[in-house]
Curated annotation (Swiss-Prot):
Keywords: Amino-acid biosynthesis, Aromatic amino acid biosynthesis, Lyase, Pyridoxal phosphate, Tryptophan biosynthesis. Belongs to the TrpB family. It comes from Buchnera aphidicola subsp. Rhopalosiphum maidis. The lineage of its organism: Bacteria, Pseudomonadati, Pseudomonadota, Gammaproteobacteria, Enterobacterales. This is Tryptophan synthase beta chain. InterPro entries: Trp_synth_beta/beta-like (IPR023026), TrpB-like_PALP (IPR001926), TrpB-like_PALP_sf (IPR036052). The gene is trpB. Pfam families: PALP (PF00291).
Length: 225
């Protein structure tokens, strides 16, 4: 949506690649993008989700790099994309830190954020990395880790190369990327941004996972507060 708004503002052509499953799951956002004049391309390759859309977008860009620019919304992929995304997303952390200091006069004990590719999480973590604040990332356990239908590569994946980056991946014994699963389209990704893998490796951040059912229950509890 942000890309389509920017393109509309500067009168640029905008092509958005989305997995066909995500188009169904995010129909309100698709409507907004089309309203701004974006061309939304349905990707039916592979699992028809985020990773396949990313692959198609990169394929398009590599064949048209002289007249187009590639943009990704998650903090993953080859350098400098994770850094670019983090720099924009860290506004989340800056605003959160400012507001909690204004209201509580102290820093929080912990920061908790969902982690798919990890852009929102790295955005809020960035402002608290050098503070005495626990950082907790929550990966999607989907239908249950034991079922294999999840998106939790940090605790249940292996290190590898994917999408132009070295990070934690969901892959089989032959090194092939496995399908991820999450009720949330934004978390349905078989890898994670490399900075999260680094934070995990040095124990600066803790990463846990919850199932789709647990996430929905938490959403309902929060909505009633």
């Amino acid at each position: 949506v942000a890309v389509s708004i920017a393109c509309a503002l500067f009168n640029l052509k905008c092509k958005i690649y989305m997995g066909y499953k995500d188009i169904k799951r995010q129909s309100p956002n698709v409507f907004r993008m089309k309203l701004m004049g974006a061309e939304v391309i349905s990707v039916r390759n592979g699992s028809g989700t985020l990773k396949d859309a990313c692959n198609e977008a990169l394929r398009d860009w590599s064949g048209n790099y002289q007249k187009s620019h590639y943009i990704i919304g998650t903090a993953a992929g080859p350098h400098p994309y994770p850094t670019i995304v983090k720099e924009f997303q860290k506004m989340i952390g800056e605003e959160a830190k400012k507001q909690i200091l204004e209201q509580e006069k102290k820093l929080p004990d912990a920061i908790i954020a969902c982690v798919g590719g990890g852009s929102n999480a790295i955005g809020i973590f960035s402002e608290f990395m050098n503070e005495k604040v626990d950082l907790i990332g929550v990966e999607p356990a989907g239908r249950g880790i034991e079922t294999g239908k999840h998106g939790a590569p940090l605790n249940h994946g292996r290190t590898g190369i994917y999408f132009g980056m070295k990070s934690s991946l969901m892959q089989n014994q032959e090194g092939q990327i496995e399908k991820s699963w999450s009720i949330s389209a934004g978390l349905d990704f078989p890898s994670v941004g490399p900075e999260h893998a680094w934070l995990h490796s040095i124990n600066r951040a803790q990463y846990v996972s919850i199932t789709d059912i647990e996430a929905l229950e938490a959403f309902q509890i929060l909505s009633k507060k």
